Design a protein with these regions (language model features):
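Extracellular, beta-strand-rich glycan-interacting domains
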Residues: 224-232, 267, 290-300, 351, ...
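Extracellular glycan-interaction surfaces
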Residues: 247-277, 292-302, 316-378, 394
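Extracytoplasmic low-complexity segments
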Residues: 207-278, 309, 315, 374, ...
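Extracellular/periplasmic catalytic domains that process cell-envelope and extracellular macromolecules
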Residues: 114-115, 141, 216-221, 265-267, ...
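Structural motif
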Residues: 279, 360-362, 403, 413
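Non-catalytic substrate/cofactor recognition surfaces at enzyme active-site rims
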Residues: 1-213
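Beta-strand acidic-aromatic groove motif in beta-rich domains, primarily in extracellular
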Residues: 301-310
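Extracellular glycan-interaction patches encoded by glycine-rich segments
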Residues: 373, 383-405
């Protein structure tokens, strides 16, 4: 039996965005690759007739985000003017949507799980994000799991909770996307429970897999290590076990593909946070000498306007990124002294390392030292904590456009050999 279904995400056509020219494939090329992939897999399967089968279903009620009194009054007045005619413009269309939601404040969702041996199949009557599918796959007790969207209904787009801060058409309260803000979390929880019921074992807890780079970081014994691989959370966990957890604030996109090198296909092993007005903030113990290292993905778009991005505020030391006339590079600016360097290319990962010691500052990009600046020590007192803000400035006025991954804090100055070795470890 073969199934061609609406998968987890509605983006059925495009292939892997990380592959060159993937979006220029013809329909014929795309279909041939899909058929070849499936046919190749079928030849390796062992066919059995004695596998366990199972089915589970539950129904949950979710609220819709009903309009307030002002919006409802506007809607009714406009519908009255329409005098029974069909809408002819966007306001009239939305007026009908507002009226319908106000009259239908609840929605019942049919959620299902199917077991075919070691395969788990989930069915959701909504169109959900790819992240929702990744949550289900990583939590599922089954060896293999896939999801079918728009099954048994069409209850609209269901974005993860954090997407409601970012906005977009999937968050507009209409028939197409009107369920409560917590809908995705409730759906994931209930469908995961069905998978547990079918398999007879509890869910798995997602932990970001280790790479050669992350293993090298752990071996270097950081004081704090925020890998930024969370699927959804207000906390960025400190992976060292030292308890220096950071806090997510504002607009961020979780669990995006993390750092990789341009000469490698994206394996999606590392996961990162995409910043859209939000921040990651951490309070760490004071250190007279310290090092902060992280992977940076410059997301500045091509524009004639000056775009000032603040990557981080590290206890008063600021790293900014500004676009230049040459779109192929952006200018990296280090403060308190305004020293600028070029060489940060858009849409690629760079390893940034800032070293602070009694002699001054060092700034490294990948395995090359870009700056060695003699300066007096920071003003922090020994008993004070240090505040690190990533994704923008500490005042909430200047944002960062791009992704960060694998932030490590060391309460000592890394040597040049250690920095180079950490960078080289990422290629293994």
């Amino acid at each position: 039996m073969g199934v061609m279904s609406q998968g987890t995400s509605g983006d059925l056509w495009w292939g892997d965005y990380s592959l060159d020219k993937a979006q220029s494939w013809s329909m014929k090329t795309y279909v041939k690759q899909l058929v070849d992939l499936v046919a190749g897999r079928l030849t390796n399967y062992e066919y059995k007739t004695d596998i366990p089968l199972g089915f589970a279903e539950s129904r949950i009620e979710l609220f819709r985000r009903t309009p307030d009194a002002v919006r409802l009054k506007w809607s009714k007045a406009l519908i009255k003017k329409m005098n029974g005619n069909r809408p002819t413009n966007r306001p009239e269309v939305y007026a009908e949507q507002v009226d319908w939601i106000s009259k239908n404040p609840l929605e019942e969702l049919v959620l299902q799980g199917v077991r075919i041996g070691d395969l788990g199949i989930t069915a959701i009557p909504c169109e959900v994000y790819g992240l929702t599918g990744l949550k289900l796959k990583s939590a599922s007790p089954f060896q293999l799991t896939f999801n079918i969207s728009l099954a048994n209904g069409a209850s609209g787009y269901i974005p993860p909770i954090e997407q409601h801060v970012l906005g977009g058409y999937t968050t507009w309260p209409a028939r197409t996307a009107g369920l409560e803000v917590n809908a995705e979390a409730r759906i994931v929880e209930e469908v995961t429970r069905l998978l547990e019921q079918l398999y007879g074992k509890g869910r798995k807890i997602y932990v970001e897999s280790n790479s050669s780079y992350s293993k090298a970081v752990f071996n270097a014994k950081p004081t704090a290590y925020w890998r930024l691989g969370e699927q959804s959370s207000s906390i960025s966990s400190d992976s060292t076990g030292n308890g220096h957890h950071a806090i997510y604030k504002g607009g961020v996109g979780f669990h995006l593909p993390g750092f990789n090198h341009s000469n490698k296909n994206e394996a999606h092993n590392s996961r990162a946070v995409h910043f859209a007005g939000g921040r990651v903030e951490a309070i760490v113990p004071y250190a007279q000498s310290f090092t902060v290292q992280f992977w940076l993905w410059n997301g500045i778009i091509k524009t004639d306007e000056l775009v000032n991005n603040q990557i981080a505020d590290l206890n008063g030391l600021n790293l900014n990124l500004i676009n230049t006339e040459n779109y192929a590079q952006s200018k990296l600016i280090f403060k308190p002294e305004k020293i600028d360097m070029t060489g940060i290319k858009p849409r690629r990962w760079e390893l940034v390392t800032l070293v602070v010691n009694s002699k001054g500052y060092e700034l490294w990009i990948n395995k090359d030292q870009q700056l060695k600046f003699k300066k007096g020590m920071l003003n922090s007192k020994k008993n004070e904590k240090m505040r690190f803000v990533f994704g923008g400035d500490s005042m909430g006025k200047v944002d960062f456009h791009g992704k960060l991954d694998e932030i490590a804090f060391f309460n000592r100055a890394l040597t040049s050999k250690e920095i180079i070795n950490l960078y080289n470890s990422s290629f293994h």
